[in-house]
Swiss-Prot record:
Positions annotated to bind ATP: G375, D376, P377, S378, T379, A380, K381, S382
Keywords of this entry: ATP-binding, Cell cycle, Cytoplasm, DNA replication, DNA-binding, Helicase, Hydrolase, Nucleotide-binding, Nucleus
CDD domains recorded: MCM5 (cd17756)
Name of this protein: DNA replication licensing factor MCM5
Span(s) of short sequence motif Arginine finger: 507-510
Gene: MCM5
Source domain of life: Eukaryota
UniProt key word Nucleotide-binding: yes
Annotated GO biological process: DNA replication initiation
General function of this protein: Probable component of the MCM2-7 complex (MCM complex) that may function as a DNA helicase and which is essential to undergo a single round of replication initiation and elongation per cell cycle in eukaryotic cells.
Length: 727
């Protein structure tokens, strides 16, 4: 037996780390040492150690730039990129040991003796490299470090994720700790107990381990859903989603609607299935990203990205200093559309926007401009919406008939696997910092239209559903297009009949355009010539790359102006605006007194703020930090040709009513009251047809209904299709 005990024992260090090229010869201890040296000794300039100082300022987390790691040691970034799940814990251990050493040095210098503590530090990675498209992530990226970008559309509640599970054997009471896989992975509990039974003792059965939750170790964990940026989605395809897992200090830092750049480990997990019928799919795994670094790129909060080249900035400043900047920008707005110069000016103001302000008492005033295009079909309203969606840095396009209140604001979704509720942002949330284009605005149900009242003025969306109470940001401009109730704008009807929208929603629009299809020989000839020329020259003389470069230049210039310029009104401009606003109010009061009816579009303090925003957007176009009286004059002119024209429309029709017309209207009122009892409901079309058989004039019947509606005697329902007698 002694022969078995003789001889030397040889051993080798064989770590369970994957090979990473030339770095395969590096031992775990050497990697740990290199990470510690990097945190201690990396310096930007003489005696400036950023990571050492950052660790002392915030001992819970340390943000590391991979470019700094590469300049310090070329092997470390390749190790982290190839096997981040193995080397990140080593990095965090190194950070904890460095922090402990720094704290002990501080304590010794201060003459205070402290017991050294093992500190947990979360390492967060960031890089200046370009993100990978979500559509290109495949099997070759599994367990590798990737960088993607998108919009967070949903966030779950915070859960407790076990890092170590404490187990107790039910038979012999032996204990052990089992580590859990990070992310969405679980713990691998052994099937048998490794305790050797004494003679006469009964051996431990199969699956004897029992989890003790109170003695296990936990961290906070949250799951997010990331969606592709709208501008990255190919035409005609649905946006892709990716599940994200964040833990520890990244929890509850992101709300739906935030634009993110994510650095993480592309991982897989087995999704739980409610049925056991999919036995053949045992090898199928669902991808997700375990986040190891988050960067908020939302332009509304970070004031836009600073990734403008010096050449671009010089070009933008040169353009801003040129003559007629306002005119040059308006010529770049929808050049394929003939005419509609005022609408193009409004679209330019909407794209640049005003300045968002925060008052000392915490109240925030919106800087985004809302525009409504109301008018006849075939007047290029939808074309304007499409152009703005393509040109705005952030934009979401939707149609009124296919949009619900939840789809526009936010919805509460129940997770099919965990059965818990989580928030999913709608169009107004996803377009935070950009533009929402809503076509067929008049086709929306009134209750859905009411849902965006708060989003249009306060620029927040309050949610109180299924136990979730929160406020989401929706700092967006709204560009809406609508048709009158009868399909076309009828000059024989009053403005109240043509603009069938509530006063509450109309007052939230800064500019309201009534776009009419005017039949004029010379104008029709020019429009026809322009459209034929556009169709004939499409893809013939113009290069698509040239058009895309022009659009991209305008988008970049808008982005630059919104990020770098936040103008305010000058003193002279403020006095000029005050005089003009008082004049408008007195003019509307005089007209209402003459006609005896209220204006269809109210002129309130919101319209005063609208002119302020328009003036600021005009100053922003030329990168000026001060809006001048000339800007106020241009803004007032645009406001006068849009909202004021709409408010004045139809009023003069009520002035010159002859005695004969008054008698006919009175007779029509009498017949309507005789035909409908109090509380009765009747179709407007049927009522007009019935009275027409009695010899009543259609226009007089409509005028009588309008007067009774203003007095509160009848009420329109179901989009003005039916009438209910109230009194």
């Amino acid at each position: 037996m002694s022969g078995w005990d003789e001889g030397a024992v040889y051993y080798s260090d064989q770590p369970q780390f994957p090979e990473a090229g030339d770095a395969a010869t590096i031992s775990p201890h050497a990697v740990l040492t290199k990470f510690k040296e990097f945190i201690r000794n990396f310096e930007i300039e003489q005696n400036c150690f950023p990571y050492r100082e950052a660790l002392l300022d915030n001992p819970k987390r340390l943000v590391v730039h991979l470019e700094d790691l590469l300049s310090f040691d070329s092997d470390l970034p390749s190790l982290i990129r190839s096997a981040p799940a193995d080397y990140l814990p080593v990095f965090e251990k190194a950070a904890g040991e460095v922090l402990t050493g720094l704290k002990m040095r501080e304590a010794n210098e201060g003459g205070v003796m402290e017991e050294p503590l093992t500190r947990d530090v979360q390492i967060l990675l960031t890089s200046r490299e370009d993100p990978v498209s979500m559509r290109l992530l495949g099997a070759q990226y599994i367990s590798k470090l990737v960088k993607i970008s998108g919009i967070s559309i949903a966030a779950s509640r915070v859960k407790a994720k076990a890092t170590y599970v404490f187990l107790v054997c039910k038979n012999c009471k032996k204990t052990r700790e089992v580590p859990c896989r990070p992310g969405l992975g679980g713990a691998i509990v052994p099937r048998s107990c490794d305790n050797i039974p004494q003679p006469g003792e009964e051996p431990c059965p199969l699956d004897p381990w029992m989890v003790v939750p109170d003695r296990s170790q936990y961290v906070d964990q949250q799951t997010l859903k990331l969606q592709e940026n709208p501008e990255d989605v190919p035409t005609g395809e649905l946006p892709r989603n990716m599940l994200l897992s964040v833990d520890r200090h990244l929890v509850q830092t992101i709300v739906p609607g935030t634009r993110l750049t994510v650095m993480g480990i592309y991982s897989i997990f087995q999704a739980s299935s409610s049925s056991n019928s999919h036995k053949g799919a045992v090898a199928i795994r669902q991808p997700y990203i375990r986040v190891v670094g988050l960067e908020d790129t939302n332009e509304a909060s970070s004031r836009g990205p600073a990734n403008f080249t010096p050449d671009e900035e010089e070009e933008f400043k040169k353009f801003a200093d040129s003559q007629d900047v306002y005119k040059n920008i308006c010529t770049k707005i929808a050049p394929s559309i003939f005419g509609h110069e005022d609408v193009k000016r409004a679209a330019a103001c909407l794209l640049f926007g005003g300045s968002r302000k925060s008052l000392p008492d915490g109240v925030k005033l919106r800087g985004d401009i809302n525009v409504l295009l109301l008018g006849d079909p075939s007047t290029a309203k939808s074309q304007f919406l499409k152009f703005v969606e393509k040109t705005a840095p952030i934009a979401v396009y939707t149609s009124g008939k296919g949009s619900s209140a939840a789809g526009l604001t936010a919805s509460v979704i129940r997770d099919s696997s965990t059965r818990e509720f989580y928030l999913e942002g709608g169009a107004m949330v996803l377009a935070d910092g950009g533009v929402v284009c809503i076509d067929e605005f008049d086709k929306m149900r009134p209750e859905d239209r009411v849902a965006i009242h708060e989003a249009m003025e306060q620029q927040t969306i309050s949610i109180a559903k299924a136990g979730i109470t929160t406020v989401l940001n929706s700092r967006t401009s709204v560009l809406a297009a609508a048709n009158p109730p009868s399909g076309r704008y009828d000059d024989l009807k009053t403005a109240q009949d043509n603009i069938d929208l509530q006063t509450t929603i109309l007052s939230r629009f800064d500019l309201i355009f009534i776009v009419k299809d005017i039949r004029k020989y010379s104008q029709d000839k020019e429009i026809a010539s322009h459209i034929i020329r556009v169709h004939a020259s499409a893809n013939k003389f113009s290069d698509e790359n040239t058009d895309s470069k022009e659009d991209n230049w305008l988008k970049r210039y808008i982005q630059y102006c919104r990020a770098r310029c936040h103008p305010r009104l000058s003193k002279d401009a403020a006095e000029n605006l005050q005089r003009k606003y008082v004049t408008i109010r007195m003019d509307m009061k005089r007209r209402a007194h003459e006609t005896g009816e209220a204006a269809p579009i109210p002129i309130t303090v919101r319209q005063l703020e609208a002119i302020v925003r328009l003036s600021e957007s005009l100053a922003k176009m030329r990168l000026s930090h001060e809006a001048t009286p000339d800007d106020v004059d241009k803004a007032f002119k645009l406001f006068d040709t849009s909202t004021m024209d709409a408010a004045r429309s139809g009023i003069n029709q009520q002035i010159n009513i002859t005695g004969e017309m008054a008698n006919e209207i009175k007779q029509a009122e009498t017949q309507i009251k005789r035909r409908m009892g109090i509380g009765a409901r009747l179709s407007e079309r049927r009522l007009i047809e019935d009275l027409a058989r009695m010899g009543m004039n259609d226009s007089m019947v409509r005028r009588a209904l309008l007067i009774m509606h203003q007095r509160g005697e009848v009420e329109y329902q179901r989009e003005r299709r039916s009438i209910v007698r109230k009194a």
